[in-house]
Structure formats: C-alpha cells, structure tokens
Amino acid sequence: RQSDVSVEDFLAKGYLPEALINYVALLGWHPEGDQEIFSLDELIKEFSLERARSSGAVFDLNKLNWFNAHYIRQKSAPELAKLCQEFLPHIANDQLEKILAIEKERLNNLAEISEKAKIYLALPDYEGAILIFKKSDTGATLNGLNLALAALNHISENNWQKETLNLALAKVVMDNSLVNG
C-alpha cells in the first residue's frame, strides 16, 4: 500500500463526499455498461455483489481528481462558495463567487482555490517588460492594454463570464488589427 489516507484527510483537502463515494464504489465494483458517474441513489440501486471484484484495487489519485472535478462543476455558485469558504475565510462570499465563476473549471479539489485566488486578491510582483511582445513596443502594448481595459469596463458584473470576456477581448484584437501574441 502507498499513501494510506483517511476519508477525513480527503475531506479536509477539499474532496467532496459524493466524489469519494463514487470513486471508492468503483474501486471494487464494476457496473454494467460504461457509466462512471453515479448518484448515491443510483449506486444503491445498481450495486450487486456479483459484479464486485476480488482482485486488489489500485488507488489512482488522478481518477479521484477527475471525479471530484466533475462534482465541483455541478455545484451552483452559492453552494460552491459556501464549500470553499473554509479555504478562504477572509474573503466575502460574493467575491468568492466571482472568483469561482472563473476558476471552477480548473479545480480538482476545493483546497486549490486558496492558491488560485491569489491572483484576484493581490497584484503580483512582475517585471513590466514581460507585457511587451517581442515584435511590439511599449506604446503599442500600452494602447492594447487600454483598449482591453475599456472593453472589459463595458461588461456588466452579471455578464462577467469566461465566454463573454473572451469574446470581448477577441473583438478588441480584431477591431484594432492587433496581434494576439
């Protein structure tokens, strides 16, 4: 055995109970068909000892992360913010919901939000020169950033979604004949 960890440890690391149950059930049991995602009610209904395996199960953290990420994406913004509150207790719930609207798709477990949220909570220290593309100059870069800022400022808070932001920035690039990279 490697890395024996209790259920409580996984919960403390931000793994959802439904992901743990789903994953552990499939470690020793194979359902009929290809279905991998099961609700607790579905597991109870579908489970049979005849389909249980006697061979030793191999724990795969990547697979558990896949299950957990799936269940995280199924949560509503308020529900997910409430679950993440223990990892960012100093953040207001409405601000956390906004961060999660962007980062939700990238989370494998809830604990990861504390690291991913840092970019939204404080400006990182960086060298200004990294903003300037190789085939550009300071003036062109500043112009592009100002155009992007103006476009983003016109998007209402309730439309602050990944797709909306990408479309707005792509429009700035197209309308102003900017080079993307």
Regions found by a protein language model. Give the residues of each.
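Small-residue-rich helix-loop
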Residues: 77-175
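Alpha-helical recognition segments enriched in aromatics with Gly/Pro capping
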Residues: 1-72, 174, 178-179
